[in-house]
């Protein structure tokens, strides 16, 4: 007579069922994550397109206004900058306590740390106070993009995490206005309503020493040195650092 089949232990059956359920849950999670990333990719593309059109329209309007002013023999008054990019170019040696405190407030604790700040009156006063230790100016859209794409790191659970995909950004900010890196670029470059949220959600950018080296750190930029306000010329400096 054939031997009777020995039934599997109940614990083994439960383990097998649990493993099947885990596999199915994992498969569903992977599928859901893939679908979310696909949807987010489409959203990011459409928003990037919208922002690009807005940037081009703004630039075209400025070009027209400059031409009209020139044709009438007038001087076109450029709008005041709303944002500044600030890079620390000197170390800690011989820094006065008050200046050290200001550098800490604007998160420039190390040499070649860089931040993007709203250029209001209090910030202008702080920048003047620590001017011998910084190079700053008015960033172009290309510079803001370069900083975020190449050197951007988010604050996630106290850790410094490199920006690698838009899902990181969506999960970090949990805000429908900030779901992709182009949203971050737009909020910063246009000084949007979430400017502070975005900048505070990132670590200061850590840049490299400029290719070709510095000129004279202890002399003002207008005197052939390095420190101080470079206005739009800061972009050429940062290209060498990013």
What are these regions (language model features)?
Residues 1-242:
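Core subunits and conserved enzymes of cellular information-processing
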């Amino acid at each position: 007579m054939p031997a009777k089949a020995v039934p599997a232990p109940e614990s083994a059956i439960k383990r097998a069922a649990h493993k099947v359920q885990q596999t199915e849950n994992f498969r569903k999670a992977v599928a859901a994550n893939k679908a979310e990333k696909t949807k987010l990719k489409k959203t990011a593309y459409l928003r990037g397109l919208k922002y690009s059109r807005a940037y081009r329209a703004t630039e075209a309007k400025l070009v027209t206004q400059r031409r009209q002013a020139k044709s009438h023999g007038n001087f076109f008054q450029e709008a005041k900058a709303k944002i500044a990019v600030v890079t620390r170019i000197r170390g800690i040696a011989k820094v006065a306590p008050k200046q050290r405190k200001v550098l800490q407030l604007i998160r420039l604790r190390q040499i070649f740390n860089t931040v993007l700040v709203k250029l209001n009156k209090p910030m202008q006063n702080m920048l003047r106070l620590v001017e011998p230790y910084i190079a700053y100016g008015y960033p172009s859209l290309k510079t803001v993009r370069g900083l975020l794409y190449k050197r951007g790191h988010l604050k996630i659970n106290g850790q410094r995490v490199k920006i690698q995909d838009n899902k990181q950004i969506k999960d970090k900010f949990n805000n429908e206005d900030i779901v992709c890196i182009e949203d971050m670029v737009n909020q910063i470059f246009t000084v949007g309503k979430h400017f502070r949220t975005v900048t505070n959600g990132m670590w200061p950018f850590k840049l490299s020493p400029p290719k070709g080296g510095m000129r004279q750190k202890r002399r003002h930029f207008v005197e052939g040195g390095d420190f101080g306000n470079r206005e739009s010329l800061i972009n050429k400096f940062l290209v060498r650092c990013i």
